[in-house]
Amino acid sequence: MNLFQNAKFFTTVNHLKDLPDTPLEIAFVGRSNAGKSSAINTLTNHVRLAYVSKTPGRTQHINFFELQNGNFMVDLPGYGYAQVPEAVRAHWVNLLGDYLQQRKQLIGLVLIMDARHPLKELDIRMLDFFHTTGRPVHILLSKADKLSKNEQIKTLSQVKKLLKPYSDRQNISVQLFSSLKKQGIDEANRTVGSWFDAADAAASSPKEN
């Protein structure tokens, strides 16, 4: 089953106080222009569920989409886009950071990186920041179609090696992904689906006194 199929827009917020009361959430985040919106549209099989723009930094709010299992997918503002006023960028940083650290419904993070330029400084800072929550991270190396088959294999191997220090501390996984070639959809579904399954199992387990 495609977990993301038939996802529908729910609401958009610009302040933590306006966050909706939801059951469980997984969030998508990445550098501006890393292909986050295209990845969301590909996973949901929807042409314009998330707005795709040639201008980086287009996602400026926290956008909520309801999944068919009743849980939610959250599209977070991209990071690393400098051509906005300092006050606006500071608001994005605070909004993003506070959501990732404080949101109790958040069960995992999907981090989008351009396969041609993975693990840039801000990506590493995001991993360092989020790992303190103990929640899982799944990395989509987007735009994999821009690489040859051999380059894809090499890049995936290198990224896995660089992620070893993180994977020792938390559940972290990585895969190749291409919106153009529809590559990696099933793998992303299985990984994120396992997060929801684990959260549901934990919620239904008897609590110890």
From Swiss-Prot:
CDD domains reported in the protein's UniProt record: YihA_EngB
InterPro entries reported in the protein's UniProt record: G_ENGB_dom, GTP-bd, GTP-bd_ribosome_bio_YsxC, P-loop_NTPase
Single GO term (MF): GTP binding
GO BP terms in the entry: division septum assembly
Keywords noted in UniProt: Cell cycle, Cell division, GTP-binding, Magnesium, Metal-binding, Nucleotide-binding, Septation
Cofactors that this protein relies on: Mg(2+)
Annotated S-S bridges: none
Domain EngB-type G, residue spans: 22-198
Positions annotated to bind Mg(2+): S37, T59
NCBIfam families documented for this protein: GTPase_YsxC
PANTHER family reported in the protein's UniProt record: ENGB-TYPE G DOMAIN-CONTAINING PROTEIN, MSS1/TRME-RELATED GTP-BINDING PROTEIN
Family: Belongs to the TRAFAC class TrmE-Era-EngA-EngB-Septin-like GTPase superfamily. EngB GTPase family.
Function: Necessary for normal cell division and for the maintenance of normal septation.
Name listed for the protein in its UniProt record: Probable GTP-binding protein EngB
Top-level taxonomy: Bacteria, Pseudomonadati, Pseudomonadota, Betaproteobacteria, Neisseriales
